[in-house]
């Protein structure tokens, strides 16, 4: 098969592992920077070009689109879809998952466990917003943030009011969530592929930090999931319309709650913590499903 990996980072661990796994299984792999692509949107023969040359036909695409280029990256992916190319995650699923508020609304509608979440526009609504999520401590999140950036723990009501007023003054889109104290600074990353969780790790925040992201110094260890956690992760990925997803859960007193569904989960942390060949599993999944899509 000829496989395209949409990525700006050929040197990144996840991209390199996917290339290695695909080549080891005899596939022709190309890393394509979506920002270098331009498109001919044509009802008869849609095409994608780079530097004056039309790209050849691909059998499958693996999107590794960074959050900062979601709009253009999704447009390029849509063009591949128009050309009949199999994509492990489609443009609609990626767009859904990148919109944190929309994600929460979709998951809530499906009855999937979530932290109590509030959203407002006017500073005059701040007192009600704080009460809505159970008061302080609470978590304030920038809707556009990634890797723990733009996530603030407000430990007192006064701090929460100050942070919310500051963000609203900057016209930033934010949401407020209850603080799940019993999680003790740990979350669980479930790696969902199709209708299975193929790997899972517990991420523990470093001392003095509440964000467990590995980019912020958190540590990862193998974890055993409960049946409810496994089911929640699979349902969350399916709700977003994603075949491949990193679903982040917290263990709360009322069961697992979903914090985020990531459409482009990194492989380095999960492969190191679980010693599983996740990259190979992804390529195997593509082989099976790309061929199914053709038949």
Swiss-Prot record:
Which positions in this protein are listed as binding Mg(2+) 1? 248, 260
UniProt signal peptide: none
Enzyme kind, highest EC tier: ligase
What InterPro entries has UniProt attached to this entry?
ATP-grasp, ATP-grasp_RimK-type, ATP_grasp_subdomain_1, RimK, Rimk_N, Rp_bS6_RimK/Lys_biosynth_LsyX
Cofactor(s) demanded: Mg(2+); Mn(2+)
Gene3D superfamilies the record matches: 3.40.50.20, ATP-grasp fold, A domain (3.30.1490.20), ATP-grasp fold, B domain (3.30.470.20)
UniProt record, GO biological process: protein modification process; SOS response; translation
Key word Ligase present: yes
Which cellular component, as a GO term, is one annotated location?
Answer: cytoplasm
A Pfam family the protein falls into: RimK
Locate the residues binding Mn(2+) 1: 248, 260
- Kindly list the positions annotated as binding Mg(2+) 2: 260, 262
What Enzyme Commission number(s) appear in the record?
6.3.2.-
- Which positions fall inside the ATP-grasp domain? 104-287
What UniProt keywords are attached to this protein's entry?
Answer: ATP-binding, Ligase, Magnesium, Manganese, Metal-binding, Nucleotide-binding, Protein biosynthesis
Molecular function in Gene Ontology: ATP binding; metal ion binding; ribosomal S6-glutamic acid ligase activity
Q: Bound how, and how many: what does the cofactor note say? A: Binds 2 magnesium or manganese ions per subunit.
Q: Which PANTHER family match?
A: RIBOSOMAL PROTEIN BS6--L-GLUTAMATE LIGASE, RIBOSOMAL PROTEIN S6 MODIFICATION PROTEIN
Q: Which HAMAP family match?
A: RimK
Can you tell me which family this protein belongs to?
A: Belongs to the RimK family.
**Protein name per its UniProtKB record:** Probable alpha-L-glutamate ligase 1
């Amino acid at each position: 098969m000829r496989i395209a990996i949409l990525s700006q980072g050929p040197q990144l661990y996840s991209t390199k592992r996917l290339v290695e796994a695909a080549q080891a299984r005899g596939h022709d792999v190309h890393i394509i920077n979506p920002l270098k692509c331009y498109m001919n949107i044509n009802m008869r023969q849609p095409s994608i070009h780079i530097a004056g040359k039309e790209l050849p036909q691909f059998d499958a695409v693996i999107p590794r689109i960074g959050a900062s280029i979601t709009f253009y990256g999704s447009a390029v992916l849509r063009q591949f879809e128009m050309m009949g190319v199999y994509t492990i995650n489609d443009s609609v699923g990626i767009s859904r998952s990148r919109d944190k508020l929309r994600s929460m609304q979709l998951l809530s509608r499906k009855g999937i466990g979530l932290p109590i979440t509030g959203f407002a526009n006017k500073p005059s609504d701040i007192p009600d917003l704080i009460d809505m999520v159970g008061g302080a401590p609470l978590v304030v999140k920038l809707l556009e943030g990634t890797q723990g950036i733009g996530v603030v723990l407000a430990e007192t009501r006064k701090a929460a009011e100050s942070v919310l007023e500051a963000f609203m003054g900057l016209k930033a889109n934010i949401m407020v969530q209850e603080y799940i104290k019993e999680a003790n600074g740990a979350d669980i990353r479930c790696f969902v592929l199709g209708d299975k969780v193929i790997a899972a790790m517990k991420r523990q925040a470093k001392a003095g930090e509440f964000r467990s992201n590995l980019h912020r110094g958190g540590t990862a260890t193998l974890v055993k999931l409960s049946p409810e956690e496994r089911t929640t992760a699979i349902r969350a990925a399916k709700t977003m319309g994603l075949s491949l997803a990193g679903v982040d859960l917290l263990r709360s007193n009322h069961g697992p709650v979903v914090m985020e569904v990531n459409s482009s989960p990194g492989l380095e942390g999960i492969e190191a913590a679980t010693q599983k060949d996740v990259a190979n599993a992804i390529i195997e999944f593509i082989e099976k499903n790309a061929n199914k899509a053709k038949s």
